[in-house]
Curated annotation (Swiss-Prot):
Residues 16-44 have a biased composition (Low complexity). This is SHC-transforming protein 1. The modification N-acetylmethionine is found at residue 1. It comes from the Eukaryota. CDD domains: PTB_Shc (cd01209), SH2_SHC (cd09925). It comes from Pongo abelii.
Length: 583
């Protein structure tokens, strides 16, 4: 009869680690030693696994900042002057393609796995992370020890440019804030698949796509393939993602960072694609698709992450004051697209698709530029402009009223060059701001999202708009005095009251916004539909997308006397008959 060996009695002085080694020597294999976890909540670092083709995902970074890791393949490569995958140190601006002999790039795990759920361990390419050093400086993205792909001053200045192909965009009908992370990733993948099927010559067009599930079909809308397949220069900076046609230098779109809510790569069959969701006046909320040369998609994602990182550090150096919800509505984004609070949100704006809500982000988008008449001015985009990038102004003292013949002889305002939107982009992380104020004993209204009474979205970029508020321009007083002498200026007037005064096509008037001081709105009737066009940008400059004017009177006189329509989003607004105010 076999007897089991007696178990050793418990001894509090027993060395458990030594006993484990002794037991392992009896035939069992000692457990593999795992690397110690970093200071953040991520698991240990693993080397890239062969055949692991999980998609690249860069999501907007708030408020779970310390949990995010970016795959940074080029961070582990020694940079050389002739390396095509990153900008050279001698000022080379365009990044052409990745190294031809480079293998498949390791990609980033899902955010759900990064947050600690599941048994799979997280890996981040590029060696050990400098997590402690990075967190000490208030960053929210852990980068490889060897650093980002590009110098910070280049990303904060002119930006890093990549030669890619613009494949079009797919309308997103629901707010990304209302979707979980997995659904957002599926939305971007499905948008990439839709575009690959629709555009001839797309890299992923040969594979058979699964039918779109019902939930995704209710989220994705129609596609816009106007510029599909066009080679473009993608410039990534702390201000925006700028898409410019490589041949004619036409700006296809300029999406500010605060209007971008999600960015991701494709699935294994579409690994060379980058998709990001942004808002603009033309496409509303849409998922824009970029096709990258082989091996370059990961660099594009990493550079976007670097731009977000730098913008957040700029906020830490210059945190804005805490604003009330009413001030937030009267700030940059609200004043630009929804200045009339009493109106329903689905009202037809001058630059809206029918039935769609006005966009919330400040964006410059010139998709319809080629359809404009020569010399025609475009509608104002709701973007702040720094004076050094607004283009040449008209000579001071140039007549803007009086004899129409004199105004007709005035040359058209010079076109504006490419613009930077903010001198010093600054960000708001409401949670960190409230904690900092409480630590120093500062007083301020509590944030309901921080206290848990309202859910906060991890990818919500809207808190940044607090940092973008600008005070009312001082010249608004003189502008108001000047407008009082114009017969077509009606003072403060609601949208409904203004539309009631329009009877014939070509009727127009200018009114002052009832909710935003210093903002003036051009209201006109075209093809039986009222149009509402903002005339003053957040810097207090009267401008259209291509030109700036000395005053509102100058803008009205220039377009009316020269019979030039204002073109925006495929529609024209002709200024023919001014509706004079009643005394």
């Amino acid at each position: 009869m076999d007897l089991l060996p007696p178990k050793p009695k418990y001894n509090p002085l027993r060395n458990e680690s030594l006993s484990s080694l002794e037991e392992g020597a009896s035939g069992s294999t000692p457990p593999e030693e795992l690397p110690s976890p970093s200071a953040s909540s991520l698991g240990p670092i693993l080397p890239p696994l062969p055949g692991d083709d999980s998609p690249t995902t860069l999501c907007s970074f708030f408020p779970r900042m310390s949990n995010l890791r970016l795959a940074n393949p080029a961070g582990g490569r020694p940079g050389s002057k002739g390396e095509p995958g990153r900008a050279a140190d001698d000022g080379e601006g365009i990044v052409g393609a990745a190294m031809p002999d480079s293998g498949p790039l390791p990609l980033l795990r899902d955010m759900n796995k990064l947050s600690g759920g599941g048994g799979r361990r997280t890996r981040v390419e590029g060696g050990q992370l400098g997590g402690e050093e990075w967190t000490r400086h208030g960053s929210f993205v852990n980068k490889p020890t060897r650093g980002w792909l590009h110098p910070n001053d280049k990303v904060m200045g002119p930006g890093v440019s990549y030669l890619v192909r613009y494949m079009g965009c797919v309308e997103v009908l629901q707010s990304m804030r209302a979707l979980d992370f997995n659904t957002r990733t599926q939305v971007t993948r499905e948008a990439i698949s839709l575009v690959c099927e629709a555009v001839p010559g797309a890299k992923g067009a040969t594979r058979r796509r699964k039918p779109c599930s019902r939930p995704l079909s209710s989220i994705l809308g129609r596609s816009n393939l106007k510029f599909a397949g066009m080679p473009i220069t993608l410039t990534v900076s702390t201000s925006s993602l700028n898409l410019m046609a490589a041949d004619c230098k036409q700006i296809i779109a300029n999406h500010h960072m605060q209007s971008i809510s999600f960015a991701s790569g494709g699935d294994p069959d579409t690994a060379e694609y980058v998709a990001y969701v942004a808002k603009d006046p033309v496409n509303q909320r849409a998922c824009h698709i970029l096709e990258c040369p082989e091996g370059l998609a990961q660099d594009v994602i990493s550079t976007i992450g670097q731009a977000f990182e730098l913008r957040f550090k700029q906020y830490l150096r210059n945190p804005p004051k805490l604003v009330t919800p009413h001030d937030r509505m009267a700030g940059f984004d609200g004043s630009a697209w929804d200045e009339e609070e009493e109106e329903p949100p689905d009202h037809q704006y001058y630059n809206d698709f029918p039935g769609k809500e006005p966009p919330l982000g400040g964006v410059v988008d010139m998709r319809l530029r080629e359809g404009a008449a020569p010399g025609a001015a475009r509608s104002t985009a709701p973007s702040a402009q720094t004076p050094s990038h607004l283009g040449a102004t008209l000579p001071v003292g140039q007549p803007v009223g009086g004899d129409p013949e004199v105004r007709k002889q005035m040359p058209p305002p010079p076109p504006c060059p490419g613009r930077e939107l903010f001198d010093d982009p600054s960000y708001v992380n409401v949670q960190n701001l409230d904690k900092a104020r409480q630590a120093v004993g500062g007083a301020g209204p509590p944030n309901p999202a921080v206290n848990g009474s309202a859910p906060r979205d991890l990818f919500d970029m809207r808190p940044f708009e607090d940092a973008l508020r600008v005070p009312p321009p001082p010249q608004s007083v003189s502008m108001a005095e000047q407008l009082r002498g114009e017969p077509w200026f009606h003072g403060k007037l609601s949208r409904r009251e203004a539309e009631a005064l329009l009877q014939l096509n070509g009727d127009f008037l200018v009114r002052e916004s009832t909710t935003t001081p210093g903002q003036y709105v051009l209201t006109g009737l075209q093809s039986g539909q009222p149009k509402h066009l903002l005339l003053v940008d957040p810097e207090g400059v009267v401008r259209t997308k291509d030109h700036r004017f000395e005053s509102v009177s100058h803008l009205i006189g220039y377009h009316m006397d020269n019979h030039l329509p204002i073109i925006s989003a495929g529609s024209e607004l002709c200024l023919q008959q001014p509706v004079e105010r009643k005394l």
